[in-house]
Structure formats: C-alpha cells, structure tokens
Amino acid sequence: MINKKKIGAFVLAGTMLLSMGTTVFAAGEPTVPNVNQNGQVPITKDFEMADGLATPNVTFKFTATSETPDALPAMIEDISYAAGDKGTLKDEKYVISKDTAISFQGTWSHVGEYVYTVTETQDPANKVENVTYDSSEYTLRVYVVNKNDNLEVEKITAEKAGTKTAKILFKNTYAKKDATLIIEKNTTGTYANKTQQFDFTIAFTKSPTESTLGEFKGTITRKGNNTSEPVITNNGPYNFKLADGDKLQFTDLPVGTTYVVTENGAKDDYTPSVTVIENAQETVKDRVAQNEEQALSTQKENGEKNLIGENTNKVTFTNTYKNVAVTGVIMNNLPFILLVAVAIVAFVSLAVMKRHIRSEKQ
C-alpha cells in the first residue's frame, strides 16, 4: 500500500514543476506593443534638414491599404510643413516632428484580424525638389472582438520588415547641393605690393545630411587675368595662394557643410584682418591678427566652424601694410642709405683735410 504522505509529496512536487514551467514560459514570451489609441493609430513624421536651410512648403500624404476582405476604410490626415517652421537640433540635424493618425471609418462587420499596409504616398505632381521620401512599409494588424454585445478593437499591432514596433515613424530629409563659398583677398597701404601672394588653408567638414565629405570643386580667378585655375579638395585640408584682387570660389556645395579658412602668419610687414558672412549673416567682422606673424582664422569666438548656407557665403581677408615714417624713408632701404651717408661724410672729410694741408703749405 502506497503511503499517502508520499503521494501528497509527489503531487505537490509536480504542481510546483508545472507552475515553474508556466512562469518561465510567460517570462520568455515577448510583449507585443499595442499601438491602439481609442481605435486610432498614431503616425509620426520627422522632417530633417541641415542648418542653413529654410523649411520648404511641402505636404506629405499616407495610405493604409486593406489586405483583408470586409475591412473598414482607413483614413489618414496629411502632414504639412511651411516656411518658418522651426526644428529641434538632433544628431547635428534640425528635426521638425509632427503627428497624424489612422482612423477607421464605419462599423466592423465581424470579429477577427484585419490587416493593412501603411505607406507614405509620393505624389509626382506635387513632389518637392530636394526632398527624400521614406519608402518604409508597415503592416498593421487590427484585432476586433465581441465586448458587451458590441464589436470593439481589442488591440492593434504594427511591424516593419517583420519586426514588431511600438511606433509608426516616417523620416524625410531636405538637402540641397547648390551652395557657393567665395574667399577673396585685398591689400591696403601706400607701399603694399599688389602682386605678393599670401598662403591660406581651408578645411571642410561634411554636412550632417551627407554620408561622406567627398570632393569639392572651385576656381581661382587672378586679378587682371581672364583665365581661371581649377581647385579640387578631397577630404583633407587644401592649401592655396591669393594676392590682391584674387578670388577662390567653390560651387555646388552641400548646404550645412562647415569650414575654417586660415591665413598663415608670415614676417612680411602685413597685418591681416578678416570678415565672414555666413548664410547672408555677418558672423565675424574685421577680426585682426595680434601681429603679422600670427595665423588668422575664420573660426567663430565660441569655437564653432563657419556654416555654408543656401544664401550668401563669403570670406574677405584684408592685409594692411605697416605705416611708413613721414620722411618717406623705407626701413628696408635704410642700410643702403646709411652706406651712402657714410660715403658722403668720408668724401667731405677727405676734402676738408686736403684743403687744410694745402693751407698749411702756403
């Protein structure tokens, strides 16, 4: 005869094992996000662009296409942006977030699962230039159940590329590659050498909407010369020379690109100054080097690099030759003048001595 206590122990152990197994299974089951909000599904639109761009007038449309018979029509309100909309800086890009929602029109006919495909609609007739559209597809599953003698939406799930997600998000990028940067050189001073060339270095940093820096092309135009010299920068800093009236112009730059131009210091009796215009705004005005041997940079006081916007971008370096004494004596020629003076003094002294000797003989 089997001991009742032993039977009880076996039953208790089995119950505990079953309970543990059930707990482990529940803990391992992934939680599926429910995107249902009172029978609607929110959609977020992130419109991103680099600094230096004005927000364009653009409207984004969406479609929820039914994949299940007897499914209700799904409606989605458009999202529009206009000039003046301001974004929030995120990952070096300005992002303007707006929301809409999917709503279902009518009454569900029966319980079950209803499947929809949600996409962003590209309207060729209203497509805005330089805007990249999002080609993402979301699968929406709507679960309808009986509740209190009525048909209600129990939950709604969304998935992208086979993975469940808690949010339907579409991203669009606005990027332009038509900006221009001009770097020009001037010299001032009565004795300034208008043909003397000065050494410069420019270093670019890619726009946050670009994946790589790439190469930038420009031309140097020399004063009084109808020919131009091609310039190609490739990732690293680029060195160049400019004299009075010369100009380096870059074209087709991605808006949002940043840069720093430096005039190398030299002991040449010239003191450089610089003025910078970024996206039609003057950000550096008549900054002067402490002395002629100090390199002069366009970098802003807060350490930020200079921005290339969709409007005017221009750097003007002006080198001023040092003041000359009122006598008109140029210090570089002083040694020669002293030699001439010594020779004259020696000649006069010799003449006086000869006259004195002649006087004594008489």
Located regions from the model:
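Solvent-exposed loop/turn and edge beta-strand elements of beta-rich ligand-binding domains
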Residues: 2-362
